[in-house]
Amino acid sequence: MTESNRLRIAIQKSGRLSTDSQQLLKSCGIKFSINEQRLIAHADNMPIDLLRVRDDDIPGLVMDGVVDLGIIGENVLEEEQIERQTLNKPAEFVKLRQLDFGACRLSLAVPSEFSYADASSLEGLRIATSYPNLLRRFMQQKGISYRDCMLKGSVEVAPRAGLADGICDLVSTGATLEANGLYETEVIYRSMACVIQSTQTQTPSKQALIDRILSRVNGVIRARESKYILLHAPTETLDQIVALLPGAENPTVLPLNDDTNRVAIHAVSTEDLFWDTMEELTALGASSILVMPIEKMMG
C-alpha cells in the first residue's frame, strides 16, 4: 500500500483505555511497538499506523476523516456528537461495535453533607464537569436550570475548592468520590469503549483491511467471553449433562477407547461455568472436567 492507503487508527495516548486498546490490537495479530516519545506507531506486519492522541480528539479525527478507525469511550463520543449537533457540524462516522472494556458511568455527585432528594435538588446550583453537553442534555430533559463550571481535570475537587456545589464526572468504583467527601446521586450516562469508523470514502483495500480487523476483534471478544469444556460422561446421563452446560452450542460427543458406557464431551460455553454447575455435573457421573480459556475464535 502507498502511504495514503495505510489504515490509520486513533487510540488514547495514555489513560484508562490506552493499555486495553493496545492489547486488543495485539490480540488481533497487529504487531507494533510503542515509543512513548512518538505519537505514531507503524505496524510491522500490516499497512497500519496507530495515532496516539488525547481521547477527546479521537471522535473529531474520525468524523472529519483524518483517521479511519478510532477506539474511544462512548461517553466521549456522545459528548462530541451533541457538540456537533449544536453547531450544525457534520459527524461522518459509524459505530462498528461496542468493546468489552472501559466500563464507567457519568454521574452527578454532591458533598456528603448535601441533602439530595432528586435531580431537582440541584436547581440553580453550580455543577463542575468535563462533559457539559451530556450534563446539559440531562438537565434539560429534567427541566432543571443550573450553572456549569467547565473543568478539564480534577473535577472531584471542585466542591471542596469552592468552585462548585456538585459535580458531574466519570465514576468507576466510587473510591475517588469518597476520598473527596462526595457521594454519587444520579447516573446520567453509562459507557463502554467502542470502535468507530469514518464514513468518508474508503479505498477497497482499506475497507477490506477494516473488515479483517473487525472480524478479528469479534473473534477476540467472543473468545474472552467463552470457555472450552472437556469432560467424560456416562451415556445414561448424557442428555442431562449436556442440558447443564451453560450456553453450549451443539457439543461434540466422541466415543472413548475401550469404554462403551462413557463418552467424551467437547463444548464451547459462552457463559461462566460455576462451581455449583461442576458439582451437579459430577453428581451425574461426569469426570475429568476441564474448563479452559480460549485465545482466539472465528466462524
UniProtKB/Swiss-Prot annotation:
Signal peptide location: none
Record key words, sorted: Amino-acid biosynthesis, ATP-binding, Cytoplasm, Glycosyltransferase, Histidine biosynthesis, Magnesium, Metal-binding, Nucleotide-binding, Transferase
Ranges in a coiled coil: none
Cofactor(s) in the UniProt record: Mg(2+)
Family: Belongs to the ATP phosphoribosyltransferase family. Long subfamily.
Function: Catalyzes the condensation of ATP and 5-phosphoribose 1-diphosphate to form N'-(5'-phosphoribosyl)-ATP (PR-ATP). Has a crucial role in the pathway because the rate of histidine biosynthesis seems to be controlled primarily by regulation of HisG enzymatic activity.
Protein's name according to its UniProt entry: ATP phosphoribosyltransferase
Species the sequence originates in: Shewanella sp. (strain ANA-3)
Lineage: Bacteria, Pseudomonadati, Pseudomonadota, Gammaproteobacteria, Alteromonadales
Gene this chain is encoded by: hisG
